[in-house]
């Protein structure tokens, strides 16, 4: 039961880590922009961009996929009312993260108070056009981008409208909540890169509180509770497996000793070691099948209930149940074989005399 649940949780964890997010999260570092550098952020960006191995630097108000929700904006009235998640960025952001434009253009230097919506927004609000206001009297739309994973898997971002937005010309209207996004070469030494970034930051803002992390770390942190629960279930599964092995070992020990004379007679009558082992294994295999049939609904229920916390989730695959059964079967067969091997190979005359 627990092994099945762990298998389902593993599927979702793997789905989270290996899904297409729509941007290059594995090569992007994120960190806070020190308050002391707010007025010199462009100079700071230039310093960081000049480091060997850095392919681009941008600024945003949030970290993608670090939360279940961000700013939610409502614009327009009546039939032209729109509601979407807003993600303030600078003009370099989409190119730094590798987010693809599907129509229109990317942001450029000098832009201010303009949107780039995702395809989900265009599908939900089909009247939105490039180079036109999102709604009458609102800011203009300069482009559309592919749907990306902008919040956690607890939401279905494939159907949720969102927009990247630049606050004021050259993001002049931003407050202090700014995040650095640094794209690095995939082959760069990560430890060395973090050290060099820290050196530049310390040089420009001595004593400031800063920390750079790869986006993968941030995403894992967003699922801390789910991953912790998975590890707990895995631990209980290992304990259950060990206890089961001890139980099977004890039963096999008792039965093999109890039937020692029978084993000797069977050996004299021509039974092979393999046939003796099969006699014991078959009995436990039947018990295993019965237990597995009873455990499947409970394992499915635990895994399915855990998946309910995710809006975007992987389907429960049949191979999880097959793999769980094969794993338990292998453990059982090895345990029975290990314990019965000695008695199955013992001199039958000696075992009969002993009895």
Question: Where do the protein language model's features map onto the residues?
Answer:
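Alpha-helical transmembrane segments
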Residues: 1-26, 306-311
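Hydrophobic alpha-helical transmembrane segments of multi-pass inner-membrane transport and secretion
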Residues: 1-10, 227-261, 289-290, 294, ...
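Juxtamembrane/transmembrane-helix interface segments of polytopic membrane transporters
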Residues: 7-10, 282, 287, 295, ...
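C-terminal membrane-exit region of the final transmembrane helix in multipass inner-membrane proteins
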Residues: 13, 258, 324-355
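Membrane-interface junction motifs in transport/secretion proteins
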Residues: 18-41
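Mid-to-C-terminal secondary-structure elements
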Residues: 46, 50-221
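Membrane-helix entry/capping segments
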Residues: 194, 203-239, 258, 303-328
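Intracellular coupling helices
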Residues: 246-287, 345-354
